[in-house]
Amino acid sequence: MSSTAPKGSTPTGPASGPSLTPYFFILFGMSAGLGSIIVLLAELRDQLGFSETGIGLAVGSGFGAAFVACLVMAPHADRGRAPAMLRAGLALAVAGMVLLAVGQELWHYVAGRIVFGFALGTAGPAARRTVIVADPANLGRNIGRLGAWDVGGFVAGPVIAAGLTAVGGFRFTFWAMALALSLLLPVAFRAQPDVAAQDQERLGLRGLLRIRRLIGAFFIVAAYFVFIGAFEAVWILEMDTRGASRAVLGVALTVGALPIALLSPLGGILAQRYGARRWAVGSLGIITLMVIFWGIVPGVVGLIALTVATSVVEGFGFPSTPMLVAAAVPEDRQATAQGLMVAVEVATGAVAAIAIAIVYDAHGDAVAWRTTAVTMAILLSIGAILTRPEDRKPVRPGVPTRTIRRPFR
């Protein structure tokens, strides 16, 4: 079930898979759409009179739909349907935006977020599967590029939404985003299926949770998304408490996310060169130490500077976790494993956001960030143990067929 190559070798030869450009563009557009939705939540509350609970219901519904889609739809990408899933996800995203544009009642917005969340959970694993198996020699670079387009869209979305809302209001923004996404449909029809092995036995999720190193990779993923959940729950509130204006918050969020988008391709190359496990554990270990100081540094400027510094480390380490997941399964299970990984991300982020918000409300930011760091350290340690190969050699995934060393039996 595994193949090997000489120690230290690197897969060579020209890429034989499909063009990745449609996958990059569409993920960028959908991430920009998600970013625009998030930044307009306060506008919906103020203009339509929704309660905080109602807004929370809409947000939670979107995450729940993405969680379900990742588990239900991802296996289909392993059966040669990735291009169709990309088109379906994009069409659903357009429909979700239209629902948000015409909605009047809370349930309209809950429905819109459910549709858009399901769209993300449908297109995401399809894109990851194709990027992973299309060009083994440049796996790290391509996963890094996918992450860069993904994060770049999420950064661009709020900026675009702010400008459009200033011109024509929040409904105009949703209509404009729906139009922009619909313009990507011709690009979606250019997406071609990969030529890698497919899940002919229709195994789906069966057996994946018996793979020790895949479970370990999920623990490492969970460690990172404890940090993400804590960030979403605490960072903006703490910046507001320290006196940051709306404008400063917007600039800080953009500047804080840019290093991830800019450095992810290089981070992927380095992770493939030095080993995905080593790179993931090392980068997350550094982030864990840095998080402790988030509750110590004084003032708005100090917190922004530390956020940017942490983001630089995130950028270098961002591609290594999906690479570690990719290294734990054969090529015909890639989309399913990546979908399960996204489900772990969503679930961990949601639980962490709730738990750390409670800690922050009761004890302040210093205790909240220390709690985050301790939780990350525990999960990361478990993941490092479970992903450790018996021969102690670096995990350098060259997925799918020219693997340097595959960490499962």
Task: Kindly give the residue locations of the regions a language model identified.
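Helix-loop boundary and gating motifs at the non-cytosolic
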Residues: P14-F63, G216, F225-R242
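Interfacial helix-cap and linker-helix signal at transmembrane-aqueous boundaries
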Residues: R45, H76-A77, G163-G168, M239-D240, ...
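Conserved MFS/SLC helix-loop-helix module at the cytosolic interface between two early adjacent transmembrane helices
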Residues: F67-A101, A271
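Cytoplasmic helix-loop-helix junction between adjacent transmembrane helices
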Residues: G112-D150
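A late C-terminal transmembrane helix in Major Facilitator Superfamily
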Residues: Q334-A362
